[in-house]
């Protein structure tokens, strides 16, 4: 299905670099991106207009999620090194599915913060774990094109989801927003099914002989990376 769609768009030269496992991962990611597109742009509207929280609190929740995900990111890296990207990705997708589903029922600030924490954990796990899996499944010289293709599929999915959400949601009607979050949570489960179907080696942990020395001190010394992070 994915191959036919992109070949019709003249993008078959990207597909030449993808084996069946990588295509499966990217297709699962695109389905999940459709779910994200359903809810991504409506998060503040949902909390503020539908649930009645102030705009300041709603914005603070978004900032909290970003900061919390950044803080636990080193821990996610350790887990990926220890257990492999595939396992962490599956875990993150199930966590995110629970968080998104729960968001449809929040009624108090503590509930919002609790759900936001779950969502942040899922976000922190999913992207780096997916990146590791994709890296292991394609040849080094093809990675730039493969990652570009993955981003393109991601953006396409988000765009489709945004269009669908505009057709589904009704202003001021709680049930239509809840429906969007339920649909979004299902796409995470679908993506998790794709991830489970991947071979174990797709995100295998590093062997002791492959493990290289290094620390975050070396990362912080990379001036180009720090400039990019500040930007």
Where are these predicted regions, by residue range?
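Helix-loop junctions at membrane interfaces in 12-TM secondary transporters
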Residues: 104-116
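Transmembrane alpha-helix termini and helix-breaking/packing motifs in multi-pass membrane transporters
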Residues: 49, 160-180
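Helix-loop boundary and gating motifs at the non-cytosolic
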Residues: 9-67, 226-231
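Structural signature of the two symmetry-related core transmembrane helices
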Residues: 87-102, 185
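Residue-level signature of mid-helix packing/kink "hotspots" within the transmembrane helices
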Residues: 66-74, 159
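C-terminal membrane-cytosol helix-exit motif in multi-pass small-molecule transporters
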Residues: 186-206
């Amino acid at each position: 299905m994915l191959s036919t769609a992109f070949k019709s768009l003249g993008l078959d030269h990207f597909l030449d670099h993808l084996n069946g496992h990588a295509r499966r991962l990217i297709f699962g990611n695109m389905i999940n991106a459709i779910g994200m597109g359903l809810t991504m742009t409506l998060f503040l509207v949902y909390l503020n207009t539908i649930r009645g929280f102030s705009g300041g609190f709603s914005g603070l929740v978004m900032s909290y999620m970003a900061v919390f995900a950044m803080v636990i990111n080193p821990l996610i890296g350790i887990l990926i090194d220890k257990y492999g990207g595939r396992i962490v990705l599956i875990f993150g997708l199930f966590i995110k599915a629970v968080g998104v589903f729960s968001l449809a029922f929040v009624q108090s600030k503590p509930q919002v913060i609790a759900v936001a924490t779950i969502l942040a954990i899922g976000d922190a796990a999913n992207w780096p774990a997916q990146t590791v899996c994709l890296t292991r499944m394609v040849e080094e010289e093809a990675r730039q094109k493969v990652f570009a293709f993955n981003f393109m599929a991601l953006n396409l999915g988000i765009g489709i989801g945004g269009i669908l959400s505009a057709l589904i949601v009704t202003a001021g009607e709680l049930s239509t927003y809840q429906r969007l979050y339920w649909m979004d949570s299902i796409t995470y489960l679908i993506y998790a099914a794709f991830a489970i179907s991947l071979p174990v080696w797709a995100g295998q942990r590093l062997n002791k002989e492959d493990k290289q020395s290094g620390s975050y001190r070396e990362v912080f010394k990379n001036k180009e990376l720090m400039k990019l992070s500040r930007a």
